[in-house]
């Protein structure tokens, strides 16, 4: 036995490195001592990860972001600014209609301009009421749908900005070019000739009645270029279709029929020239498509030499509203009002998986 132990000791000394400075070897601490010192858990965790990667070599490690950023911040204060912008331009439109009304030439002196649609289609008196009723239905459907949208603040500011900009354009076109009435059936209110107080009353009457004929507030002439009714009918349909599920084809079809029938009824009633309707449709659809293309594409939000859309005068306003919105808005719905947290709390006791296993073990013993 002594000979065997001596041989093992000599073999151990031969296997050690020749460097005299490294002759001391630190003894390995037992596992219990490492756990006491708090050093056992990280080593066991790292060794477990290494074993897991060896066992599952096909797994791909994904780096998680350090900070989770909201891709669609609500920013209701921006929506409030867009709402004020829309209301201001709508009120400005009523003021401009009142001003332009004083410049409309009498129909006896300036007869209606020739219009091909009017040459082939006779006037139907009740058609304009149908157009306004369709517009009211579409606006009601859109407001109801908007209330149930999850990201209603972002969609709301888009709608307010677009409709405000369209009515700002309408103020400009009405003021620079005053067209005669489209038909001899028009009964325009008498001119006030500088009576400021009466003009204010007319403005308030237009605002309170929504500028609709069925409410008796559409008594002024001159707001022909371009058609505000066409703007409303077209824009509400575009927003309804854009922010509703794609498989709601029946819903889209009904809204499209309401919009198309309303626009046709404007012409059948001879309330607007055909050019008024064409320009209104063109400007509304282009502004809607341009805005949403820029909002959905990250590269179009940057002002550059190749991005010609960034040269629009409203691009700084657009960037202010959309700079924090990352990508296309998903079609998600939620309740308009959030219930208190305690309303739907269950009185039943909740168990974790660990607690359930422990109780099962107790029952088995």
UniProtKB/Swiss-Prot annotation:
Annotated Basic and acidic residues bias: 1-14
Name of the molecule in the record: Phosphatidylcholine:ceramide cholinephosphotransferase 2
Similarity remark: Belongs to the sphingomyelin synthase family.
Transmembrane segments: 80-100, 128-148, 159-179, 206-226, 248-268, 275-295
Active site: 229, 272, 276
Tissue: Brain, heart, kidney, liver, muscle and stomach. Also expressed in a number of cell lines such as carcinoma HeLa cells, hepatoma Hep-G2 cells, and colon carcinoma Caco-2 cells.
Lipidation (S-palmitoyl cysteine): 331-332, 343, 348
Catalytic function, reaction form: an N-acylsphing-4-enine + a 1,2-diacyl-sn-glycero-3-phosphocholine = a sphingomyelin + a 1,2-diacyl-sn-glycerol; an N-acylsphinganine + a 1,2-diacyl-sn-glycero-3-phosphocholine = an N-acylsphinganine-1-phosphocholine + a 1,2-diacyl-sn-glycerol; an N-acyl-(4R)-4-hydroxysphinganine + a 1,2-diacyl-sn-glycero-3-phosphocholine = an N-acyl-(4R)-4-hydroxysphinganine-phosphocholine + a 1,2-diacyl-sn-glycerol; an N-acylsphinganine + a 1,2-diacyl-sn-glycero-3-phosphoethanolamine = an N-acylsphinganine-1-phosphoethanolamine + a 1,2-diacyl-sn-glycerol
Phenotype upon changing residue 343 to A: Strongly decreases palmitoylation. Abolishes palmitoylation and dramatically reduces plasma membrane localization
Organism encoding this protein: Homo sapiens (Human)
Membrane topology category: Multi-pass membrane protein
Involvement in disorder: Calvarial doughnut lesions with bone fragility: A rare autosomal dominant bone disease characterized by low bone density, distinctive X-ray translucencies of the skull, multiple fractures, elevated serum alkaline phosphatase, and dental caries. Patients present with childhood onset of primary osteoporosis and typical sclerotic doughnut-shaped lesions in the cranial bones.
Activity regulation: Inhibited by bacterial PC-phospholipase C inhibitor D609.
Function: Sphingomyelin synthase that primarily contributes to sphingomyelin synthesis and homeostasis at the plasma membrane. Catalyzes the reversible transfer of phosphocholine moiety in sphingomyelin biosynthesis: in the forward reaction transfers phosphocholine head group of phosphatidylcholine (PC) on to ceramide (CER) to form ceramide phosphocholine (sphingomyelin, SM) and diacylglycerol (DAG) as by-product, and in the reverse reaction transfers phosphocholine from SM to DAG to form PC and CER. The direction of the reaction appears to depend on the levels of CER and DAG in the plasma membrane.
Phenotype upon changing residue 272 to A: Completely abolishes enzyme activity. No change in subcellular location
Recorded consequence of changing residue 276 to E/A: Completely abolishes enzyme activity. No change in subcellular location
Post-translational modification: Palmitoylated on Cys-331, Cys-332, Cys-343 and Cys-348; which plays an important role in plasma membrane localization.
UniProt keyword annotation of Cell membrane present: yes
Positions on the Cytoplasmic side per record topology: 296-365
């Amino acid at each position: 036995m002594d000979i065997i132990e001596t041989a093992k000791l000599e073999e151990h000394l031969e296997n050690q490195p020749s460097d005299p400075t490294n002759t001391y070897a630190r003894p390995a601490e037992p596992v219990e001592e490492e756990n006491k010192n708090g050093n056992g858990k990280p080593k066991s965790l790292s060794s477990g990860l290494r074993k897991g990667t060896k066992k599952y070599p096909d797994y791909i490690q994904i780096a998680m972001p350090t900070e989770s950023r909201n891709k669609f911040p609500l920013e209701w204060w921006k929506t409030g600014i867009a709402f004020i912008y829309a209301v201001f331009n709508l009120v400005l439109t009523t003021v401009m209609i009142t001003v332009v009304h004083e410049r409309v030439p009498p129909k006896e002196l300036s007869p209606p301009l020739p219009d091909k649609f009017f040459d082939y289609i006779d006037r139907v008196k009740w058609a304009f009421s149908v157009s306004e009723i369709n517009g009211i239905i579409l606006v009601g459907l859109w407001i109801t749908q908007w209330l149930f949208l999850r990201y209603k603040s972002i969609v709301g500011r888009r709608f307010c900005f677009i409709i405000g900009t369209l009515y700002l354009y309408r103020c400009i076109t009405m003021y620079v070019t005053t067209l005669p009435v489209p038909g001899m059936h028009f009964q325009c209110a008498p001119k006030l000739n500088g009576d400021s107080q009466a003009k204010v009353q007319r403005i308030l009457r237009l605002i309170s009645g929504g500028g609709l004929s069925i409410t008796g507030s559409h008594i002024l002439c001159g707001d022909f270029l371009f058609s505000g009714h066409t703007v409303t009918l077209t824009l509400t349909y575009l927003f309804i279709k854009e922010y509703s599920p794609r498989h709601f084809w029946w819903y889209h079809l009904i809204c499209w029929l309401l919009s198309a029938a309303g626009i046709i009824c404007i012409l059948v009633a001879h309330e607007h020239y055909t050019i008024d309707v064409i320009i209104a449709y063109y400007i509304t659809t282009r502004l809607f498509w341009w805005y949403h293309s820029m909002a959905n594409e990250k590269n179009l939000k940057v002002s550059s030499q190749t991005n010609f859309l960034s040269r629009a005068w409203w691009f700084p306003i657009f960037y202010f509203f959309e700079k924090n919105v990352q990508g296309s808005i998903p079609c998600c719905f939620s309740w308009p009002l959030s219930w208190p947290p305690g309303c739907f709390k269950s009185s039943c006791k909740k168990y974790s998986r660990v607690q359930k296993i422990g109780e099962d073990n107790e029952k088995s013993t």
